[in-house]
């Protein structure tokens, strides 16, 4: 009995020492918590005793000192390592996603870097604010200066320098804007709209010239139509005037016919005399001089009669004078002028024909 008691006391002392050692080692405590709880078999293996009562007394210490508890400690450390790796991977993924733009700045070439920065900024290179509602360029067609400014904001200075030809590479932006403004002022709004729509400049010029030509042709046609209408209206107005003149001024036509007959007789008389005596040149000269004088007098008389300035002859009927009295201080009408011109032409033609007939036998 005394031997059993002494062995029990020794075991209790050992278990107390092991518990104190477990409390003294802080790194091993989380391993115990990570393993959940110690197994009774591990405690039995650590104590070297096969009895269950011994394991029940020192369940915590057995779990720490046993072989099984040692395996659980190693398993807990591996789990912690896995969790640390997961945390590192999540931290690295978040850091990669957060520093993607910074890494892209160093990895992309210069041109792609500019495009990347332009996409991730609210202000473009030329100063165009993307937060403001955009409007088409044709919206500013009434204000060409503002339209030019919007175009330069869209393009940007660096892009413009790349797009410029070699002739304008050395020009400043202000000078290029001034040149563009001068060229823009020369263009019409219609042509600017066609250029913005993508039409070729030559095609638009040809279309404008065709439009101008068609307008000119239409204007000429309208003028011709108006002239035709005016002439037709004049003719229609002249026809009743001619009838009135024929009806009301029968004495004028009679006088003209009488004068014409007298003129013809005057021309025929000297012609016959000249034909009868061709050998006498003096008579022919005198007859020609008298013919010219008679012609002038006859023309003056006919003009006065047509214009209504000559005195009415006593032989004219009174009814005619009553119906159409000779107007005084009245401008000649177009019909009267036409009649005068026709009579003078007819007499001139007759005179030329007679003169030709006189020269032939001579």
UniProtKB/Swiss-Prot annotation:
Residues 1-14 have a biased composition (Basic residues). This is Caspase activity and apoptosis inhibitor 1. Residues 33-44, 65-74 have a biased composition (Gly residues). It comes from the Eukaryota. Pfam families: CAAP1 (PF15335). The modification Phosphothreonine is found at residue 90. Residues 282-312 form a coiled coil. Anti-apoptotic protein that modulates a caspase-10 dependent mitochondrial caspase-3/9 feedback amplification loop. The keyword Ion transport does not apply. Residues 19-32, 273-282 have a biased composition (Low complexity). Signal peptide: none annotated. The keyword S-adenosyl-L-methionine does not apply. The gene is CAAP1. Disulfide bonds: none annotated. One of its GO terms (biological process) is negative regulation of apoptotic process. The lineage of its organism: Eukaryota, Metazoa, Chordata, Craniata, Vertebrata. Residues 235-251 have a biased composition (Basic and acidic residues).
């Amino acid at each position: 009995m005394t031997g059993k008691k002494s062995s029990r006391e020794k075991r209790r002392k050992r278990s107390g020492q092991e518990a104190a050692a477990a409390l003294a080692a802080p790194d091993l405590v989380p391993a115990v918590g990570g393993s959940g709880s110690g197994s009774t078999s591990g405690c039995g293996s650590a104590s070297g005793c096969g009895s269950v009562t011994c394991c029940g007394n020192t369940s915590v210490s057995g779990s720490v000192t046993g072989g099984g508890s040692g395996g659980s400690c190693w398993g807990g450390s591996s789990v912690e390592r896995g969790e640390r790796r997961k945390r590192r991977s999540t931290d690295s993924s978040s850091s990669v996603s957060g520093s993607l733009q910074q890494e892209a700045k160093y990895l992309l070439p210069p041109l792609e870097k500019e495009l990347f920065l332009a996409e991730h900024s609210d202000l473009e290179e030329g100063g165009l604010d993307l937060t403001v509602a955009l409007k088409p360029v044709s919206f500013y067609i009434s204000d060409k200066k503002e339209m030019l400014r919007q175009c330069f904001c869209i393009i940007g200075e660096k892009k413009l320098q790349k797009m410029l030809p070699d002739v304008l590479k050395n020009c400043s932006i202000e000078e290029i804007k001034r040149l563009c403004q001068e060229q823009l002022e020369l263009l019409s709004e219609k042509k600017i709209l066609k250029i913005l729509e993508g039409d070729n400049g030559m095609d638009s010029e040809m279309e404008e010239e065709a439009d101008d030509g068609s307008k000119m042709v239409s204007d000429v046609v309208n003028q011709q139509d108006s002239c035709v209408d005016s002439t037709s209206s004049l003719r229609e107005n002249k026809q009743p005037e001619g009838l009135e003149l024929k009806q009301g001024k029968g004495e004028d036509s009679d006088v003209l016919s009488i004068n014409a007959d007298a003129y013809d007789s005057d021309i025929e008389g000297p012609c016959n005399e000249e034909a009868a005596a061709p050998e006498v040149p003096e008579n022919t000269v005198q007859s020609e001089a008298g013919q010219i004088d008679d012609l002038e007098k006859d023309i003056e008389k006919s003009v006065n009669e047509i214009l209504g300035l000559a005195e009415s002859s006593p032989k004219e009927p009174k009814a005619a004078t009553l119906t159409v009295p000779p107007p005084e201080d009245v401008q000649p009408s177009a019909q009267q002028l036409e009649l005068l011109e026709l009579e003078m032409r007819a007499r001139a033609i007759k005179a030329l024909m007679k003169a030709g007939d006189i020269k032939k036998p001579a």
